[in-house]
Amino acid sequence: RLSLVGSEMCIRDRRIPNKENPNVLEEVVKQEKMLDVFKEHLRWNYIMGLSNVGDFNLACETGHATDLINVAEALQEKKIAQIADDIYRRGENGNRVKLVLISGPSSSGKTTFSKRLSVQLMTNGLRPYPISLDNYFVDREDTPRDENGNYDYESLYALDLELFNTQLQALLRGEEVELPRFNFNLGKKEYKGDKLRIDEHTILILEGIHALNPELTPQIPAASKYKIYVSALTTISLDDHNWIPTTDNRLLRRIIRDFNYRGYSAQETISRWPSVRAGEDKWIFPYQENADVMFNSALLFEFAVLRCHAEPILTSVPRNCPEYAEAYRLLKFIKYFTPVQDKEIPPTSLLREFLGGSSFKY
């Protein structure tokens, strides 16, 4: 449990019942780096006088919504700049970072974060180059299958780890490498003359769900890697007793993004969510504390903005389908927030990845 007393942070470990067996208490798993992120953002909430949703709504209703947006966006930009500066300083100390690894769960904003980090790295005189793990899938017939017999593309072993590490090592030695392109129609890698050679100013940016898994890059020296974990960690509570689950933040983002860009209804996104969460529990969360730094992509004001976009999508879920209960719960939840329009949100905001209107290309 986290709470603020005066200007100090109080931290208490509380064991909670197991989901499958309420008679058994869960073991306490220490997550010191994530705790530091919560402490930092709770401290800022306290400074701004926002301890719960009621405080936030009052600030919006008294004409301070734009101020909240500006401060929240500035805090994120400052944090991204600090991460870029830390990467650069490591090179000055003789441990030049050659590979930045970015991981995080679904709809955490990894893609926009990587683009904004690349901008900040360029201000330090570095040349970021993105590497896509999607191009390193094994041939389709070699892809592992899940318990239902379907191709499991979220598995680490759906990737050609040997080729990936061989090419990374060659790049870090200064050799020229022809990068593969995965043809999803044929289910095979192709080579189209996409060659790459990096110099001392180039830094590779790798974003993906397996980026923090040590099995992904076992042959790359630890000193050459900088690991970042990105997630939307909600740090405002409904009241003094009810915390907002961080997964609700990401689910609302995904519902809006899937509707805007992938043609999926809220019903379809909600139905897929349990399998997405299962993949996160298996492939992402166990490795989050491996990160050198954690970045909180949640914005203090975002539920108020998400409400305006999510309400019409959620209300379209039929009452007679299994997903209606979850849609109704989310609708009831977002109505606790005073709605805020997105016109004041800058085009580089992480939220633009889901709402649209971003100045970045995806």
Task: Give names to the regions the model predicted.
Residues 1-6, 11:
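Single conserved hydrophobic/aromatic residue that forms the stacking wall/gate
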Residues 110:
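Conserved lysine of the Walker
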Residues 129, 138, 142-185:
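Conserved nucleotide-sensing/catalytic segment adjacent to the nucleotide-binding pocket
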Residues 113, 117:
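Hydrophobic positions on the alpha1 helix immediately C-terminal to the Walker A/P-loop
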Residues 100-102:
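Hydrophobic anchor at the beta1->P-loop junction of P-loop NTPases
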Residues 91, 218-362:
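Conserved NTP phosphate-binding and transfer environment spanning the P-loop NTPase/kinase superfamily
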Residues 94, 164-223, 273-287:
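Glycine-rich phosphate-binding loop used to anchor ATP phosphates in small-molecule kinases
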Residues 35-81:
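Charged, amphipathic alpha-helical linker segments immediately N-terminal to NTP-binding catalytic cores
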